[in-house]
Amino acid sequence: KLSAAAEVKEGKFGAGSYIVRMDQPYSRMADMLLDTQYYNVNDPRPYDDTGWTLGPLRNVKTIRVKDEKILAASMSIINGPAKVTGKVEGVGNAGFVVNHTGESAVTQLRYRLKDVKFSAAEAAFKVGERSFNAGSFIVKTEGNPSDLSARLAKEATDLGLTATAVDKLPDVAQHAVGTPRIALVHTWVNTQNEGWYRIELDRLGIPYDYISDQDVGKMANLREKYDVIIWGPVGGNAQSILRGIAKFSDSEAAIPWKGSALT
């Protein structure tokens, strides 16, 4: 991580910029994950996942630097995951605004502050010279816990978000945003894709119920219990999804899909 700004042929990079040095044994890994991938049209078609250029995937500006001067720049090694530190900026007691950037951290913030009242802007707006996207959170001081400022600052800092304090709430159409009750559906038709959802929901700390497709058929009113139902991508057609995996014999018991005496 750059300790001070550095300027090379490819441009000027500010303090805090991340440098992946190529004078290390794992430089080939950086090539594979960060540089543009070129495929020869005469080669066999790639099999399975090939979207490995992480910069565009994560909307992070990533530049390959050929100027060796960058290796002499003042920098410090990062021991552990690189993490962006968020902040609270601005002055005001009316409330806070958090831009909707499409990051998962925005959703995490809502769930971490479940008892706080949030609203979402229905159109883009500005606070001073700064622009905010439609969907940005507006958190009023009035009607919220007295420790709102400290709690919001703590979570925004940890999640890498910027919360802007305002002395006047944005004049924009908005609606209340709660914490949706989520169900993730298990089906034996395809377990891999639902597993990716489970991994990410668990990593983000977003609560959900893990239910079987058989449960879905037995519930009289799903809307009464859940606001969002996630069904991972599966192959086949509507009929094969509805029927699921057939038994080998009539005597075969249901296949366990959670921890049990059999599994």
Which ranges hold each PLM region?
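Intrinsic-disorder/low-complexity accessory segments
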Residues: K1-T263
